[in-house]
Amino acid sequence: MDASMVPRVPHKVGVVGYGRLGQSLVSRLLAQGSELGLELVFVWNRDPGRMAGSVPPALQLEDLTTLEERHPDLVVEVAHPKIIHESGVQILRHANLLVGSPSALADQTTERQLLEASNHWGHTVFVARGALWGCEDISRLDAAGGLQSLRVTMATHPDGFRLEGPLAAAHSSGPRTVLYEGPVRGLCPLAPRNSNTMAAAALAAPSLGFDRVIGVLVADLSLTDMHVVDVELTGPQGPQAAALPCTPTERTQPSLALSLAPLLLQPSGTAYWAAVSFPPDLGSASAEFPPLPLLSP
């Protein structure tokens, strides 16, 4: 029989988290997954009541520790960094893992444990790049030794932040206030939901990493329905240097935290869908979600 005539075995996907991104991803998997050889085998949420009426009961997973019973090939985390801290190792025992909350990897213990689990069980960790575009270019420049500094600034309305620790008490002192400026490693535990783009940058540039990539968090009262991400790269200086000593770029997109319009879910939801549709370890590579080489077996 012609190989093209052989039915393709669908890749089994589990989704951890049923917030806005999780809902978008689950909806598209149910509607279009079979066309791309993907089968949704479970959805887990810390509050199971949120899935009532929208996720078929047979797909609702009550206990995340029993995920192996669903035999997933890939588990997509779109919940909170705590899930990676608490359950990342267990997930890797049974499946590949797509981390939608890369700020979790700022914790060195978590990163080490995931590396060990990946090597031991032969499963791979993939990382969502979120709003970080040009991720491949950053990685190539870093690998070539041409990246001296990397700075990522994220600005949005103060109501768009979900801050913890000392930053939780931070207040805007004017129309535009810098809440944090420093190493991304220090920012991630204080703003776990608002630092994922910066964490993705730190992972894309391992020579700098979480300690040398600079993250800046800005509260801007004028940004009522969007957030703005600025990425600034600095390359080598001098006569032998590349022609691009400093490159600032900016991206503006709707803010999911503030917007009530369902259509504004599309930018992030589409990115996650692209990653699951073509997971690098399971088929065609996806530029949206480059794998984490250090966490690949």
Curated annotation (Swiss-Prot):
Coiled coil: none annotated. Signal peptide: none annotated. InterPro entries: Asp/hSer_DH_NAD-bd, Asp_DH, NAD(P)-bd_dom_sf. GO terms for molecular function: aspartate dehydrogenase activity; NADP binding. The modification Phosphoserine is found at S24, S172. GO terms for biological process: NAD biosynthetic process. It comes from the Eukaryota. Keywords: Phosphoprotein. Belongs to the L-aspartate dehydrogenase family. This is Aspartate dehydrogenase domain-containing protein. The lineage of its organism: Eukaryota, Metazoa, Chordata, Craniata, Vertebrata.
